[in-house]
UniProtKB/Swiss-Prot annotation:
Residues forming coiled coils: none
Protein name stated in the entry: UPF0212 protein AF_0282
Record Pfam families: DUF555
Family per record: Belongs to the UPF0212 family.
InterPro entries listed in its UniProt record: UPF0212
């Protein structure tokens, strides 16, 4: 059975952030705390989005009045999955179990050689 790299995105709310950079750091740290120690192999990063006007890449963070919505990316290797769909289900289950109120969406599943 093949191995897969599954990429998920999540919407993370950060309250009382002083800046966009602060919100990104807090979101990654909070997500890391929820995943550790069981899933410390999951890579966490702030996602990117494209500017609707010029198409240049921007960090996926929106901040108003000290509250930020941060788009996080989780990368997880899933071993011995039956199919890409099965790998996505496993990753979503394992991460979602530790973050029950965080919306997760699969954005990519790639087979690892």
């Amino acid at each position: 059975m093949p191995d897969y790299l599954v990429v998920l995105q999540a919407a993370w709310i950060v309250r009382k952030a002083r800046s966009v950079e602060d919100a990104m750091n807090i979101a990654v740290a909070e997500a890391g705390k929820k995943l550790n120690p069981d899933l410390d192999f999951v890579k966490i990063d702030v996602g990117d989005t494209a500017c609707p006007k010029c198409n240049s890449p921007l960090k996926a963070v929106f901040m108003v009045a000290g509250v930020a919505l941060v788009g996080l990316i989780f990368e997880m290797k899933v071993f011995n999955a039956k199919s890409p769909e099965h790998a996505a289900k496993i990753a979503k289950y394992e991460i979602g179990k530790r973050m029950p109120r965080i919306p997760l969406e699969v954005i990519e599943v790639a087979e690892i050689e």
